[in-house]
Regions:
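Short, exposed beta-strand/loop patches in secreted or surface proteins that constitute
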Residues: 29-31, 37-39, 72-78, 83-84, ...
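Mature N-terminal segment immediately following signal peptide/propeptide cleavage
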Residues: 26-50
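A low-complexity, Ser/Thr/Gly/Pro-enriched, surface-exposed linker/loop concept
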Residues: 41-80
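Bacterial N-terminal signal peptides
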Residues: 8-16
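Bacterial N-terminal signal peptides that target proteins for export
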Residues: 1-8
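Catalytic and substrate-binding clefts that recognize carbohydrates or anionic sugar/phosphate headgroups
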Residues: 78-225
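Boundary at the C-terminal end of the N-terminal hydrophobic targeting segment
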Residues: 19-22
Length: 225
């Protein structure tokens, strides 16, 4: 009897915690019009969407499984034909009704207290801190010693892929081609995105606070299991 009562109480507590969590999260859409939508995930992370047909993606993607975020303080202004979204870490400016995001109509700059940067579409990081590699088969330290490994030749140095963080103080993620989940009630599965030329971007500003960057990333990509 005591075990059953304890189980019931735990279920009730879990339901209350889920309800409180839902109350403290929201979509945080800062601006939307016929073709663009900007979402403030945190003071250091933005989602930027362009859709020619005006059909924005609300389904979870293979990379971004969260669409609800904690409440964030930000300022929205529309002046001189530009949309401005300002947080404590960055300012984004987009020229209204100018089409897909390009280096001519979109710019994101660091806030005064942050490591300075000025980013436009197409810019590449200079100080990526690198990530991982598909396999270490045949490696002796950072040198390939075997001939049968497809990715590298014997004697070649290990070439790490770019990672999430960089000394530049910002990270750009393009999820425009990422698979989506179909929200099937019986078995959630992946599906392709509509071939409509849409853009689904994420931008993170963090300076040298890499711990904060990792936390911001988990807000939309999910926590480590």
């Amino acid at each position: 009897m005591k075990k059953k009562l304890l189980l019931i109480l735990l279920c009730i507590l879990q339901s209350v915690l889920f309800a409180l969590q839902a109350q403290n999260t929201q979509r945080n859409i800062a601006y939307t019009d016929d073709n663009v939508r900007f979402t403030v995930i945190s003071d250091g992370a933005l989602r930027l969407e362009y859709a020619l047909d005006g059909k924005f993606v609300d389904d979870r993607s293979h990379m971004a499984i969260n669409r609800l975020y904690p409440q964030v303080d930000y300022k929205l202004k529309t002046r001189g034909g530009w949309v401005e979204i300002t947080t404590s870490k960055m300012k984004m400016r987009y020229k209204k009704n100018s089409g897909q995001f390009t280096d001519k109509n979109l710019i994101i700059t660091a806030a005064k207290e942050m490591l300075p940067f000025s980013w436009k579409p197409g810019m590449q990081q200079k100080g990526n801190l690198k990530g991982t590699y598909r396999t270490l088969d045949g490696m002796d330290g950072d040198t390939q010693t075997q001939t049968w490994v497809a990715d590298t030749k014997k004697g070649e140095k290990l070439k790490l892929e770019d990672g999430l963080l960089a000394t530049d103080g910002w990270t750009f993620i393009d999820d425009s081609q990422g698979l989506l989940f179909d929200n099937d009630k019986d078995w959630d599965w992946v599906k392709e995105r509509p071939a409509n030329g849409g853009q689904d971007w994420y931008f993170m500003a963090y300076g040298h606070d890499y711990k904060a960057a990792l936390k911001d990333y988990t807000l939309f990509a999910g926590k480590v299991p």
